Protein backbone atom coordinates (compact mmCIF):
# COMPACT_ATOMS: atom_id res chain seq x y z
CA UNK A 1 0.00 0.00 0.00
CA UNK A 2 1.36 3.42 -0.92
CA UNK A 3 1.80 6.27 1.52
CA UNK A 4 -1.42 8.10 2.25
CA UNK A 5 -0.74 11.83 2.46
CA UNK A 6 -3.77 12.34 4.72
CA UNK A 7 -2.60 9.96 7.42
CA UNK A 8 -1.08 11.42 10.57
CA UNK A 9 0.78 9.95 13.54
CA UNK A 10 -1.52 8.59 16.25
CA UNK A 11 -0.63 11.45 18.58
CA UNK A 12 -1.25 14.08 15.89
CA UNK A 13 1.01 15.67 13.31
CA UNK A 14 4.53 16.42 14.57
CA UNK A 15 5.69 20.03 14.39
CA UNK A 16 9.32 21.14 14.20
CA UNK A 17 8.79 23.68 16.95
CA UNK A 18 8.05 20.80 19.33
CA UNK A 19 11.32 18.97 18.55
CA UNK A 20 14.10 20.72 20.56
CA UNK A 21 17.02 19.12 18.69
CA UNK A 22 15.77 20.69 15.45
CA UNK A 23 15.24 24.21 16.79
CA UNK A 24 18.80 24.95 17.93
CA UNK A 25 20.83 27.69 16.25
CA UNK A 26 23.36 25.31 14.69
CA UNK A 27 20.57 23.32 13.01
CA UNK A 28 19.73 25.05 9.72
CA UNK A 29 17.04 24.22 7.15
CA UNK A 30 16.29 25.66 3.74
CA UNK A 31 12.69 24.45 3.81
CA UNK A 32 11.43 23.69 7.35
CA UNK A 33 7.98 22.74 6.05
CA UNK A 34 9.50 20.05 3.82
CA UNK A 35 11.61 18.72 6.70
CA UNK A 36 8.48 18.54 8.86
CA UNK A 37 6.60 16.72 6.08
CA UNK A 38 9.33 14.10 5.64
CA UNK A 39 9.61 13.53 9.39
CA UNK A 40 5.88 12.82 9.58
CA UNK A 41 6.17 10.41 6.65
CA UNK A 42 9.03 8.61 8.40
CA UNK A 43 7.06 8.39 11.64
CA UNK A 44 3.95 7.01 9.91
CA UNK A 45 5.97 4.54 7.82
CA UNK A 46 7.75 3.08 10.84
CA UNK A 47 11.15 1.38 11.16
CA UNK A 48 10.30 -1.34 8.63
CA UNK A 49 10.46 1.21 5.79
CA UNK A 50 13.67 2.92 6.99
CA UNK A 51 17.27 2.59 5.91
CA UNK A 52 20.35 4.69 6.72
CA UNK A 53 23.09 5.64 4.26
CA UNK A 54 26.07 7.35 5.89
CA UNK A 55 29.52 8.55 4.98
CA UNK A 56 32.31 7.57 7.41
CA UNK A 57 35.18 10.08 7.53
CA UNK A 58 34.09 13.20 9.45
CA UNK A 59 30.47 12.00 9.46
CA UNK A 60 30.57 9.01 11.78
CA UNK A 61 33.89 10.34 13.05
CA UNK A 62 34.15 13.85 14.46
CA UNK A 63 35.38 16.85 12.49
CA UNK A 64 37.12 18.07 15.63
CA UNK A 65 37.63 16.72 19.16
CA UNK A 66 37.10 18.64 22.39
CA UNK A 67 40.81 18.60 23.21
CA UNK A 68 41.70 19.89 19.75
CA UNK A 69 43.31 16.63 18.71
CA UNK A 70 43.33 15.70 15.05
CA UNK A 71 41.04 12.95 13.82
CA UNK A 72 42.71 10.99 11.02
CA UNK A 73 40.79 9.90 7.96
CA UNK A 74 40.53 6.20 7.15
CA UNK A 75 43.43 6.63 4.74
CA UNK A 76 45.27 8.56 7.46
CA UNK A 77 45.03 5.52 9.74
CA UNK A 78 46.63 3.39 7.03
CA UNK A 79 49.33 5.99 6.39
CA UNK A 80 50.30 5.86 10.08
CA UNK A 81 51.29 2.19 9.85
CA UNK A 82 54.99 1.84 10.64
CA UNK A 83 55.89 -0.83 8.08
CA UNK A 84 55.00 1.27 5.05
CA UNK A 85 57.96 2.22 2.80
CA UNK A 86 59.79 5.40 3.80
CA UNK A 87 58.67 7.42 0.81
CA UNK A 88 55.04 6.25 0.99
CA UNK A 89 53.81 8.78 3.53
CA UNK A 90 55.66 11.65 1.85
CA UNK A 91 54.14 10.80 -1.52
CA UNK A 92 50.61 10.33 -0.16
CA UNK A 93 50.93 13.62 1.76
CA UNK A 94 51.78 15.34 -1.51
CA UNK A 95 48.65 13.90 -3.08
CA UNK A 96 46.54 14.95 -0.09
CA UNK A 97 47.78 18.53 -0.11
CA UNK A 98 47.20 18.72 -3.86
CA UNK A 99 43.74 17.15 -4.06
CA UNK A 100 42.05 17.72 -0.69
CA UNK A 101 41.72 21.51 -1.27
CA UNK A 102 40.08 20.70 -4.60
CA UNK A 103 37.67 18.27 -2.92
CA UNK A 104 36.40 20.93 -0.48
CA UNK A 105 36.72 23.95 -2.80
CA UNK A 106 33.33 25.70 -2.59
CA UNK A 107 33.78 27.37 -5.97
CA UNK A 108 34.76 24.48 -8.27
CA UNK A 109 31.89 22.64 -10.06
CA UNK A 110 31.48 18.99 -9.06
CA UNK A 111 31.82 17.86 -12.69
CA UNK A 112 35.31 19.37 -12.71
CA UNK A 113 36.19 17.91 -9.31
CA UNK A 114 35.39 14.37 -10.45
CA UNK A 115 38.38 14.15 -12.77
CA UNK A 116 40.69 15.29 -9.99
CA UNK A 117 39.22 12.72 -7.59
CA UNK A 118 39.80 9.94 -10.13
CA UNK A 119 43.40 11.12 -10.48
CA UNK A 120 43.84 11.14 -6.70
CA UNK A 121 42.42 7.64 -6.17
CA UNK A 122 44.31 6.20 -9.16
CA UNK A 123 47.65 7.60 -8.01
CA UNK A 124 46.95 6.41 -4.46
CA UNK A 125 46.34 2.90 -5.77
CA UNK A 126 49.60 2.96 -7.71
CA UNK A 127 51.49 3.99 -4.57
CA UNK A 128 49.81 1.22 -2.56
CA UNK A 129 51.39 -1.58 -4.57
CA UNK A 130 54.42 -3.84 -4.61
CA UNK A 131 55.27 -4.27 -0.92
CA UNK A 132 54.22 -6.64 1.90
CA UNK A 133 51.79 -5.42 4.54
CA UNK A 134 50.34 -6.90 7.73
CA UNK A 135 46.71 -5.77 8.09
CA UNK A 136 46.88 -6.12 11.88
CA UNK A 137 48.80 -2.84 11.83
CA UNK A 138 45.59 -1.09 10.80
CA UNK A 139 43.87 -2.55 13.86
CA UNK A 140 46.63 -1.25 16.13
CA UNK A 141 46.32 2.31 14.79
CA UNK A 142 42.52 2.23 14.59
CA UNK A 143 42.25 1.22 18.25
CA UNK A 144 43.59 4.65 19.20
CA UNK A 145 40.71 6.45 17.51
CA UNK A 146 37.56 4.62 18.56
CA UNK A 147 36.95 7.61 20.88
CA UNK A 148 36.80 9.88 17.81
CA UNK A 149 33.31 8.77 16.82
CA UNK A 150 30.67 11.47 17.21
CA UNK A 151 29.11 11.72 20.65
CA UNK A 152 26.24 9.23 21.05
CA UNK A 153 27.35 7.18 18.04
CA UNK A 154 27.24 3.98 20.10
CA UNK A 155 23.67 4.74 21.13
CA UNK A 156 22.73 5.61 17.54
CA UNK A 157 24.01 2.30 16.18
CA UNK A 158 22.35 0.45 19.07
CA UNK A 159 19.06 2.17 18.17
CA UNK A 160 19.45 1.09 14.54
CA UNK A 161 20.18 -2.50 15.52
CA UNK A 162 17.26 -2.65 17.96
CA UNK A 163 14.86 -1.29 15.33
CA UNK A 164 16.23 -3.60 12.62
CA UNK A 165 17.14 -0.71 10.32
CA UNK A 166 19.72 -1.60 7.61
CA UNK A 167 22.67 0.79 7.73
CA UNK A 168 25.01 1.32 4.79
CA UNK A 169 28.33 2.98 5.60
CA UNK A 170 29.51 4.36 2.27
CA UNK A 171 33.12 5.53 2.28
CA UNK A 172 35.42 6.84 -0.41
CA UNK A 173 38.22 6.17 2.08
CA UNK A 174 39.89 2.89 3.01
CA UNK A 175 37.39 0.20 3.91
CA UNK A 176 39.89 -1.81 5.95
CA UNK A 177 40.28 1.13 8.34
CA UNK A 178 36.54 1.84 8.42
CA UNK A 179 35.72 -1.76 9.36
CA UNK A 180 38.50 -1.83 11.97
CA UNK A 181 37.31 1.35 13.73
CA UNK A 182 33.65 0.29 13.70
CA UNK A 183 34.45 -3.23 14.90
CA UNK A 184 36.72 -2.08 17.73
CA UNK A 185 34.16 0.55 18.76
CA UNK A 186 31.58 -2.26 18.99
CA UNK A 187 29.17 -0.69 16.51
CA UNK A 188 29.68 -3.05 13.54
CA UNK A 189 26.39 -4.81 14.16
CA UNK A 190 24.85 -7.36 11.74
CA UNK A 191 22.61 -4.66 10.23
CA UNK A 192 25.67 -2.57 9.19
CA UNK A 193 27.27 -2.96 5.75
CA UNK A 194 30.46 -1.16 4.65
CA UNK A 195 31.00 -0.32 0.97
CA UNK A 196 34.40 1.27 0.39
CA UNK A 197 37.85 0.88 -1.17
CA UNK A 198 39.48 -2.28 0.18
CA UNK A 199 43.11 -3.31 -0.16
CA UNK A 200 43.87 -6.19 -2.47
CA UNK A 201 46.91 -8.47 -2.51
CA UNK A 202 48.74 -10.43 -5.18
CA UNK A 203 51.42 -13.00 -4.39
CA UNK A 204 51.65 -11.72 -0.82
CA UNK A 205 52.19 -8.09 -1.85
CA UNK A 206 49.81 -5.14 -1.84
CA UNK A 207 48.25 -4.59 -5.25
CA UNK A 208 46.25 -1.39 -4.93
CA UNK A 209 42.50 -1.39 -4.29
CA UNK A 210 39.65 -3.68 -5.22
CA UNK A 211 37.32 -2.44 -7.95
CA UNK A 212 35.14 -0.51 -8.40
CA UNK A 213 36.93 2.65 -7.32
CA UNK A 214 34.76 4.69 -4.95
CA UNK A 215 35.53 8.40 -4.68
CA UNK A 216 33.70 11.30 -3.07
CA UNK A 217 31.46 12.02 -6.04
CA UNK A 218 30.48 8.56 -7.32
CA UNK A 219 29.45 6.76 -4.15
CA UNK A 220 25.73 5.97 -4.36
CA UNK A 221 23.40 3.01 -4.21
CA UNK A 222 23.72 2.36 -7.95
CA UNK A 223 26.99 0.50 -7.18
CA UNK A 224 25.04 -2.04 -5.11
CA UNK A 225 24.67 -5.14 -7.25
CA UNK A 226 20.99 -5.92 -7.77
CA UNK A 227 21.74 -9.56 -6.98
CA UNK A 228 23.49 -8.73 -3.71
CA UNK A 229 22.11 -9.73 -0.34
CA UNK A 230 22.16 -6.11 0.83
CA UNK A 231 20.21 -4.91 -2.21
CA UNK A 232 17.55 -7.52 -1.45
CA UNK A 233 17.40 -6.18 2.10
CA UNK A 234 16.94 -2.49 1.27
CA UNK A 235 15.36 -2.15 -2.18
CA UNK A 236 11.83 -2.00 -0.71
CA UNK A 237 12.81 0.41 2.08
CA UNK A 238 11.82 3.76 0.64
CA UNK A 239 12.36 5.98 3.70
CA UNK A 240 16.02 6.97 3.80
CA UNK A 241 18.22 9.13 6.03
CA UNK A 242 21.40 10.19 4.23
CA UNK A 243 24.27 11.64 6.27
CA UNK A 244 27.51 13.19 5.06
CA UNK A 245 29.99 16.02 5.45
CA UNK A 246 30.63 16.85 1.78
CA UNK A 247 28.32 17.96 -1.03
CA UNK A 248 28.86 14.71 -2.94
CA UNK A 249 27.54 12.71 0.01
CA UNK A 250 24.04 14.04 -0.64
CA UNK A 251 23.79 11.81 -3.72
CA UNK A 252 24.53 8.56 -1.87
CA UNK A 253 20.90 7.48 -2.23
CA UNK A 254 20.91 7.96 -6.01
CA UNK A 255 19.54 4.86 -7.66
CA UNK A 256 16.65 4.33 -5.25
CA UNK A 257 13.06 4.58 -6.56
CA UNK A 258 11.89 8.11 -7.34
CA UNK A 259 8.99 7.64 -4.93
CA UNK A 260 11.36 7.37 -1.98
CA UNK A 261 11.26 9.90 0.86
CA UNK A 262 14.82 11.01 1.64
CA UNK A 263 16.10 13.18 4.48
CA UNK A 264 19.59 14.52 3.75
CA UNK A 265 21.65 15.65 6.77
CA UNK A 266 24.89 17.55 6.14
CA UNK A 267 27.59 18.12 8.77
CA UNK A 268 29.27 21.43 7.89
CA UNK A 269 32.63 22.37 9.42
CA UNK A 270 35.10 23.58 6.76
CA UNK A 271 34.68 27.08 5.26
CA UNK A 272 31.28 27.50 6.94
CA UNK A 273 30.27 30.85 5.47
CA UNK A 274 31.57 30.10 1.97
CA UNK A 275 29.91 26.67 1.91
CA UNK A 276 26.66 27.53 3.68
CA UNK A 277 24.55 28.32 0.60
CA UNK A 278 25.62 25.18 -1.27
CA UNK A 279 24.99 23.01 1.78
CA UNK A 280 21.60 24.62 2.38
CA UNK A 281 20.69 24.05 -1.29
CA UNK A 282 21.86 20.42 -1.12
CA UNK A 283 20.87 19.08 2.30
CA UNK A 284 17.50 19.21 4.06
CA UNK A 285 19.21 19.76 7.42
CA UNK A 286 22.63 21.41 7.83
CA UNK A 287 24.36 20.92 11.19
CA UNK A 288 27.08 23.52 11.79
CA UNK A 289 29.98 22.29 13.95
CA UNK A 290 27.80 19.63 15.55
CA UNK A 291 30.00 16.76 16.76
CA UNK A 292 27.11 14.56 17.92
CA UNK A 293 24.55 12.09 16.57
CA UNK A 294 21.77 13.88 18.44
CA UNK A 295 19.71 14.93 15.40
CA UNK A 296 19.61 11.52 13.67
CA UNK A 297 18.93 9.88 17.05
CA UNK A 298 16.02 12.26 17.56
CA UNK A 299 14.51 11.19 14.24
CA UNK A 300 14.81 7.53 15.24
CA UNK A 301 13.24 8.20 18.64
CA UNK A 302 10.21 9.81 16.98
CA UNK A 303 9.85 6.84 14.64
CA UNK A 304 10.20 4.37 17.52
CA UNK A 305 7.71 6.21 19.73
CA UNK A 306 5.01 6.00 17.04
CA UNK A 307 5.93 2.37 16.33
CA UNK A 308 5.31 1.49 19.98
CA UNK A 309 1.96 3.30 19.91
CA UNK A 310 0.98 1.32 16.83
CA UNK A 311 1.87 -1.94 18.57
CA UNK A 312 -0.14 -0.95 21.63
CA UNK A 313 -3.25 0.13 19.70
CA UNK A 314 -4.55 -3.40 18.89
CA UNK A 315 -4.09 -4.40 22.53
CA UNK A 316 -6.08 -1.39 23.72
CA UNK A 317 -8.88 -1.96 21.21
CA UNK A 318 -9.27 -5.59 22.30
CA UNK A 319 -9.85 -4.63 25.93
Swiss-Prot record:
Residues binding substrate: 171-172
Recorded GO CC terms: cytoplasm; cytosol
Example of a GO biological process term: guanosine-containing compound catabolic process
Molecular functions per Gene Ontology: 5'-nucleotidase activity; magnesium ion binding; nucleotidase activity; nucleotide binding
Residues at which Mg(2+) binds: 55, 57, 245
Enzyme class: hydrolase
Regulation: Inhibited by high levels of AMP.
One Pfam short name: UMPH-1
Family annotation (InterPro entries): HAD-like_sf, HAD_sf, Pyrimidine_nucleotidase_eu
Residues bound to N(7)-methyl-GMP: 103, 124
Active-site residues from the entry: 55 (nucleophile), 57 (proton donor)
Reported cofactor(s): Mg(2+)
Effect on the protein upon substituting residue 76 to N: Decreases KM 6-fold for m(7)GMP. Decreases KM 1.5-fold for m(7)GMP and increases KM 1.5-fold for CMP
Keywords: Hydrolase, Magnesium, Metal-binding, Nucleotide metabolism, Nucleotide-binding
UniProt xrefs under CDD domains: HAD_5NT
Catalytic activity: N(7)-methyl-GMP + H2O = N(7)-methylguanosine + phosphate; CMP + H2O = cytidine + phosphate; a ribonucleoside 5'-phosphate + H2O = a ribonucleoside + phosphate
Gene3D superfamilies: HAD superfamily/HAD-like, Pyrimidine 5'-nucleotidase (UMPH-1), N-terminal domain
Activity versus pH, per record: Optimum pH is 7.5.
Residue numbers binding CMP: 103
Quaternary structure, from the entry: Monomer.
Protein family membership: Belongs to the pyrimidine 5'-nucleotidase family.
Function: Specifically hydrolyzes 7-methylguanosine monophosphate (m(7)GMP) to 7-methylguanosine and inorganic phosphate. Also able to mediate hydrolysis of diphosphate (m(7)GDP) to 7-methylguanosine and 2 inorganic phosphate with lower activity. The specific activity for m(7)GMP may protect cells against undesired salvage of m(7)GMP and its incorporation into nucleic acids. Also has weak activity for CMP. UMP and purine nucleotides are poor substrates.
The name this protein goes by in its record: 7-methylguanosine phosphate-specific 5'-nucleotidase
The encoding gene: cN-IIIB
Amino acid sequence: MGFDEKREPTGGRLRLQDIPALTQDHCRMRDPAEVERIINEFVIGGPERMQIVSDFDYTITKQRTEDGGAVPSSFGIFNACQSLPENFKAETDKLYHKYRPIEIDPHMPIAEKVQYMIEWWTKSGELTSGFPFDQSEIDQIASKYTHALRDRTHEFFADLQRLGIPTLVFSAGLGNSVVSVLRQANVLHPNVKVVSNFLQFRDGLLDGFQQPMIHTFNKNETVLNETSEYYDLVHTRDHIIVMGDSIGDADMASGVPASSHIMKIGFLFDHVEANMKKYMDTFDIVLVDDQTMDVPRTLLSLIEKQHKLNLEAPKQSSL
